[in-house]
């Protein structure tokens, strides 16, 4: 029997130091007919800006920059221990900084200048991970990454001559502890049995009820779903981390690590996978959702501007120096380049029209370095802006845009909204494959700007989609995955996509799948729902072949607790050392 069910789309505020979104609702409602058994919820109260503004930062339990000093002391002490040990005697320390329980340092001081290599020996059918710096020295300090929890891990140090000839090896056993009981472990739907690669899926599954208080964890999963890296959950989690250079990664700093009592983070940190924090930079305004590492070494970060009643419509370009504050070189206000259209499904949809009109959730730089793209969820638009801050193009359904934006709207080759081409809706995670091909995570929210033609959840879907953008401002859809799964993968509020050139494959994080307790599909309904997340790697072929599928889900019908994943990064544990 058909029922009327109230659909209220949330405007989500994802803080840099949080792994969940705090979402506000507006009071007006509209209805769609839904044939699922989703529960009907009462209308929420009318919320004001005070309800959705980011909470105050609170007090700091420890000045964040002392963390760098503490970690430097730990590292220097380990170097000293290696140098004072007997010559050619390995020294090891698991989780040296208390932040990465599946990582270690090993060191050895040789009697003459040599090269050293560390090899992590896997079990049957598992890849062997190895790292060999080019440095010739007597004191070797090597990161050991990709260990298993609660396991006697076999590690080998191989010494090479200055010319690279193996001279001898040392075998070590590193016994790791079990991970925290609360650490989420995926159900493995499909996993590789052979032809393994070294990459891990770095994700932050958060357990909780809807968008309420979450219990986040940041972990790295191999292609069998085994956890091979983890961040200490007592220090929080980061929703996003990306490999940078010299072994370092960049990440939004977890709130607990910063010593904060709540609120969203203003900190970007550089760390390595052994857990050492190398640098921390503070921004003037809140950091959120995404950052891109640019070809010139700078970073572009989604942030808030100084306006008191606008959020998530600004990007800064910053140089990372040895000073404690971000050196901001450029600021882009989206309102200066883009004339907005009425928000998706009009203002009744609860998108906080005065505050969160754009909702920037993704940034990437074109491989040529001439322009950047910015994903605006609440405009269902991916916007390209040239380096001189002029508008280049808009990837969006053409309905509702001001006339001045018409010349910039990409025009599809192939029939609009057909089997050959579909627009993206509420999208996340723009990723360039090359200068002309762009991936998006197409969340699919309603697939319309009007309720009369909106797609209800039980008929909807989310996709990984690849577009080709031509120089004449035409656009083609050249590849996709997800529509064939229907509502089973419908994730209306978060998600991500990444292209893996090494294997010509695509990884999708369907991280915000929304259902009710009984497992029926739902949009974000009156603020309460149950999350599930799928991490899926597929071949970049037509049709795509599923290579790996890992699921985080709570099927207990007596609880609303589930799992969400904001986004993911796919990389070998040693990839930052080769950048």
What are these regions, as identified by a protein language model?
Residues 85, 125-131:
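Low-complexity "stalk/linker" and mucin-like segments enriched in Ser/Thr/Pro/Ala/Gly
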């Amino acid at each position: 029997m058909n029922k009327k069910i109230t659909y209220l789309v949330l405007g989500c505020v994802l803080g840099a130091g949080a792994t969940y979104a705090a979402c506000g609702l507006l009071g007006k409602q509209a209805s769609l007919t839904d044939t699922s058994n989703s529960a009907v919820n009462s209308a929420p109260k009318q919320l004001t800006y005070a309800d959705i503004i980011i909470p105050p930062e609170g007090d700091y339990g420890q000045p964040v920059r002392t963390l760098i000093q503490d970690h430097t002391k730990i590292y220097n002490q380990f170097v000293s221990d290696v140098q004072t040990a007997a010559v050619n005697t390995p020294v090891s320390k698991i989780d040296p900084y208390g932040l990465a329980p599946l990582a270690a340092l090993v060191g050895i001081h040789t009697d003459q200048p040599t090269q050293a290599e560390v090899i992590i020996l896997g079990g049957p059918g598992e890849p062997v991970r190895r790292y060999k710096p080019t440095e010739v020295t007597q004191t070797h300090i090597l990161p050991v990454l990709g260990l298993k929890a609660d396991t006697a891990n076999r590690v080998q140090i191989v010494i090479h001559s200055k010319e690279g000839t193996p001279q001898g090896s040392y075998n070590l056993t590193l016994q790791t502890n079990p991970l925290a009981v609360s650490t989420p472990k995926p159900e493995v739907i499909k996993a590789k049995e052979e032809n393994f690669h070294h990459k891990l899926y770095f994700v932050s599954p958060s357990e909780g009820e809807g968008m309420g208080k979450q219990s986040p964890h940041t972990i790295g999963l191999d292609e069998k779903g085994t956890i091979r890296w983890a961040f200490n959950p007592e220090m929080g989690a980061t929703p996003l981390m990306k490999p940078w250079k010299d072994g370092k990664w960049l990440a939004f700093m977890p709130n607990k690590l910063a010593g904060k009592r709540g609120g969203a983070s203003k900190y970007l940190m550089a760390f390595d996978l052994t857990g050492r924090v190398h640098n921390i930079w503070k921004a003037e305004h809140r950091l959120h959702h995404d950052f891109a590492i640019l070809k010139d070494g700078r970073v572009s970060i989604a942030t808030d501007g100084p306006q008191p009643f606008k959020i998530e419509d600004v990007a800064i370009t910053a140089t990372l120096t040895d000073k404690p504050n971000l050196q901001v070189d450029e600021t882009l206000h989206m309102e200066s380049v883009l004339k907005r259209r009425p928000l998706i499904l009009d203002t009744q949809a609860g998108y906080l029209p005065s505050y969160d009109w754009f909702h920037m959730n993704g940034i990437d730089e074109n491989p040529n370095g001439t322009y950047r793209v910015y994903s605006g969820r609440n405009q269902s638009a991916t916007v390209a802006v040239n380096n001189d801050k002029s508008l280049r193009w808009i990837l969006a359904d053409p309905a509702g845009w001001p006339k001045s934006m018409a010349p910039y709207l990409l025009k599809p080759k192939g029939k609009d909204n057909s089997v050959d081409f579909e627009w993206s809706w509420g999208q996340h995670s723009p990723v360039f494959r090359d200068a002309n091909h762009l991936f998006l995570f197409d969340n699919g929210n309603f697939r319309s700007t009007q309720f009369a033609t909106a797609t209800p959840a039980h008929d909807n879907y989310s996709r990984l989609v690849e577009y080709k953008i031509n120089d004449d401002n035409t656009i083609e859809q050249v590849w996709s995955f997800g529509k064939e799964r229907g509502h089973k993968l419908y994730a209306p509020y978060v998600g991500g996509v990444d292209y893996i050139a090494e294997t010509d494959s695509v990884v999708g994080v369907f991280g915000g799948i929304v259902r009710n307790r009984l497992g029926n599909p739902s949009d974000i309904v009156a603020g309460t729902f149950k999350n599930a997340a799928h991490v899926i790697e597929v071949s970049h072929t037509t049709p795509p072949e599923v290579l790996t599928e890992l699921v985080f889900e709570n099927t207990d019908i007596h609880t609303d607790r589930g799992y969400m994943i904001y986004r993911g990064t796919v990389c070998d544990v040693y990839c930052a050392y080769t950048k």
